[in-house]
């Protein structure tokens, strides 16, 4: 089967699914398990040499592009977020390349990429950082603040958390990707 990925080393379209497949014994790492470039050979070995792994801008990069890749027949499976179909293939803005909902099979989600957090080091907290953190948290308190968060950050709220809770199962799945610890650990 030919796979359509959102891009090289992208969370939902590459790291989570491949980490899941490797970690659960479905896919075997091809190449040096300490080298991130082995991931490409692993994808091609598990799926197909004709799989789409965009690097940079192409019609098949991003969530929309990976779905389009599958729907136009360039691939057999799109590795995307579960919300992508509704974002691009429903309503008056649906793209002409979209298949009808009953023509696609959507699997149950098996992992989730963490949101894009605002990070700070608690050991280096100065008054300016504390003020910023409090201001961001206060935006959750009313509709005007929620509108600001949506307009600026495309999120509906800011939730205080720690790295371990925030990463959840993502860290476990991604740790199975060859070379991830050496390159990013």
Predicted stretch roles:
Residues 17, 83, 114-117:
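Proline-rich low-complexity regions
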Residues 8, 111, 163:
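Residues that form or immediately flank small-molecule/cofactor binding pockets and catalytic motifs
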Residues 1-67, 72, 147, 152-160:
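Bilobed "Venus flytrap"/periplasmic-binding protein-like clamshell domains
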Residues 22-23, 63-101:
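A ligand-binding cleft/hinge motif common to bilobed small-molecule-binding domains
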Residues 120, 124-185:
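An extracytoplasmic/periplasmic, membrane-proximal ligand-sensing/linker region
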Residues 30-53, 90-133, 156-157:
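Periplasmic-binding protein-like
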Residues 8-12, 83-86, 123-126:
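Solvent-exposed loop/turn segments at secondary-structure junctions
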Residues 2-6, 76-80, 119:
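Structural recognition of the beta-strand scaffold that forms the well-ordered cores
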